[in-house]
C-alpha cells in the first residue's frame, strides 16, 4: 500500500485533492495516506461507522466530490469482522466521483474468495504475513490500464523497456 499510495499521489493527485478512508481502517491503510497527504498537501476525510460497525454509506456519499481522487476502504475489519458491501461502495464511488477504489484485503483475502472483476474495484492490496508469509511483503493487484498509467516508485530489473542516458521507458505490465 505504501508503494501504491506514493505512486498514485505522485502521478494522479495534486494539492487540495481528497482521499477518503473509514473510521474503522487498520493503521496500515491510514499511515501511507497520511504520509502522502502531508507531502502533496492532500486532505483525508473519514467515513463514519454505524453502531453495528458497518460503514455509513450516506456519509460516504456526502463526502464524495470532484476533488476525491482515492477511496481506500478495508475489505474486512480486523477489529469487528465487518464486511463492507464493496459492490455498493463501488456503485457510490462511480456515481459520485472519478476516484480510484482501493480495497485493503489483508483480512479479506486469506479467508474469502475475492473476484476483483466482479467487485469492479481498481486496486486490491494485501500483506503476505497474514497468510503465514514473511513480514514486509505484499501484493498489489490493479487494473492493467491503471498500473500502466502509474510511474514506478523504485526502478530496476525487468521493469525497464529501454534505457538511454537522458531517460528510461518502462516495460508494460
Q: Which residue ranges define each predicted feature?
A:
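Pyridoxal 5′-phosphate
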Residues: 1-173
Amino acid at each position: 500500500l505504501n508503494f501504491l499510495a506514493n505512486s498514485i499521489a505522485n502521478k494522479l493527485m495534486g494539492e487540495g485533492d481528497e482521499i477518503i478512508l473509514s473510521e474503522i481502517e487498520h493503521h496500515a491503510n491510514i499511515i501511507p495516506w497520511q504520509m502522502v497527504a502531508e507531502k502533496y498537501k492532500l486532505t483525508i476525510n473519514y467515513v463514519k461507522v454505524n453502531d453495528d460497525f458497518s460503514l455509513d454509506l450516506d456519509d460516504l456519499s456526502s463526502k464524495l466530490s470532484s476533488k476525491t481522487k482515492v477511496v481506500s476502504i478495508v475489505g474486512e475489519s480486523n477489529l469487528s469482522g465487518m464486511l463492507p458491501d464493496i459492490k455498493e461502495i463501488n456503485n457510490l464511488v462511480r456515481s459520485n466521483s472519478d476516484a480510484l477504489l482501493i480495497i485493503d484485503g489483508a483480512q479479506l483475502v486469506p479467508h474469502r474468495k475475492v473476484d476483483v472483476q466482479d467487485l469492479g474495484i481498481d486496486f486490491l492490496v494485501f500483506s503476505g504475513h497474514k497468510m503465514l508469509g514473511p513480514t514486509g511483503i505484499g501484493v498489489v493487484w490493479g487494473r492493467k490500464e491503471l498500473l500502466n498509467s502509474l510511474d514506478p516508485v523504485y526502478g530496476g530489473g525487468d521493469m525497464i523497456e529501454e534505457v538511454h542516458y537522458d531517460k528510461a521507458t518502462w516495460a508494460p505490465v
